[in-house]
Amino acid sequence: MSFRTRLLFFGIAWLIVLMPFLFWWSTWFGRQLSDAKLNEYLHDVNKPRHIQHALVQLSDRMSRNDPVAKKYYPEMVTLASNPSVEIRNTDAWAMGQDTTVPEFHQALLKMLQDPALMVRGNAALALVRFGDASGRPQIVSLLQSANVLAPATGKLTDTAKPGTAVREGGLIAKVQTGSQTLEARSPLTGRVALVNMPRGAEVAAGAQLAVVDPGESQVWEALRALYVIGTPDDLPAVARYEREQPDLPDRIRQQAILTEHAIRQRMENK
């Protein structure tokens, strides 16, 4: 496959991965911002959602080659290290809109080491458009369940129920330690698959409290990306979704089958 053909393939695949995400974000941040408002929101350090809104608007402008967006590129690179997980998450997606910017590419590569699972995953997905498969392990991790661990030794005073839908950062459990109550939160959006300990149990710091399965959107995006960059090592993670699952639509199963087929075809063509 020639370099040009490979880039075209990556570009088409990126659109497949990107469009569901942009549709979802538009339901939250769809209100169009004027140039003045965009500038105001992007610099509103007291309201992270305003910065997110501005980044989504910038992403849309970048996709339309709006020259106004370019003057904010240095700030987008800076936002890659913002303390807010939500801002870093959105920033990773936005930077994937212009693959001609080496600074974006470098920032996204650094974000593969971000402490937040979803930021790492979104950076990896964005890198696909650059023709860069460096984030493949992070994309595979988007297909895997996440463990929720006890933040400290103490008494488990509250837990979510199995089957509960939860957003990234959603409360899973509370642990009482001395006079303090500490919270254990979900690292991803999905559904509580398992709760390991009952309320009232004594738990040690780092003990597994619950398991959260990834949600539909996350799984869909990861499978689409692996359709393009997946390797034989990824087949076990993909195969899990080839079986019918009550909490996921049939399109996930169908995409998993297509992804496995694409990976095996690449193996045969080598």
Predicted region positions:
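Hydrophobic membrane-insertion alpha-helices, especially the h-region
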Residues: 6-26
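Short inter-helical turns and helix N-cap capping residues of alpha-solenoid HEAT/ARM repeat scaffolds
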Residues: 46-47, 83-84, 115-116, 147, ...
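Residue-level detector of extended alpha-helical repeat arrays and alpha-solenoid scaffolds
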Residues: 50-51, 88, 120-121, 219, ...
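Short beta-strand-turn/beta-hairpin segments enriched in glycine/proline and small hydrophobics
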Residues: 140-156, 171-192, 211-212
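Acidic, glycine-anchored pre-beta loop/turn
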Residues: 157-166, 195-206
